[in-house]
Amino acid sequence: DYATITYTSGTTADPKGVVLTHRNYTANVEQSLSRIDIPSSYRTLIILPLDHCFAHVVGFYIMIACGASVATVQIGATPMETLKNIPQNIREVKPNFLLSVPALAKNFRKNIETSIRAKGPFTERLFDFALRTAYIYNQDGYHKGKGWRILLAPVVGLFDLVLFRKVREAFGGSLEFFVGGGALLDSELQRFFYAIGIPMFQGYGLSEATPVISTNSPKYHWHK
């Protein structure tokens, strides 16, 4: 039976209505869970619009299938007020993972860097050095800590303890990863979030595929 008519984003042509069945959705949930494990204790906060199958499958249905918890952003009197509720809602919900798109990822990074700059030039320089060190250690993700870079592990661990952990606390302190979609996420952004301990696992999908086709995961990932 038909479940929804989902419209494509219109990236390459005019948006088109895609008829998706209940089995389309349940099959994609099963496929997604073969790549990323979701314990029943997990929580997520849906920030993305609720009118697309990305939020349906990865935000709602996989959580329902695993008996996990879902929250949505508190609606404000205006769209801008709703956006302003996101940071507070994240701290309240303490999500284990979040859905993201490139625009949202850029905004998160901008806010993090603004907060670091506000702490003064010493903290800013230290954060930049810690970030560069983590980049060298992590490489492309798949080859993290390989070869001589294993020697950097204690240094990266120290930076994580004194710097990156404090950044993660702004996301509730429980955030383990993002699932990214919607468009190609710049590899530099992927490296940034990986360095601070909140990997953004890039996925690829099509509305016609309900939508997940492939994705990086905690076990298999490569920043490209």
Where are the regions a protein language model picked out?
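Alpha-helix/helix-capping structural signal
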Residues: R23, A103, A183-L184
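Structured core elements
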Residues: T4-Y7, G17-V19, L45-I46, A71-T72, ...
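Conserved AMP-binding A3 loop
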Residues: A3-V29
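Conserved S/T- and glycine-rich ATP-binding loop of Class I adenylate-forming
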Residues: Y2, T8-T11, T44, P49, ...
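Conserved ATP-binding loop and adjacent catalytic segment of the adenylate-forming AMP-binding
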Residues: A71-V73, L151-G157, E169, G173-G180, ...
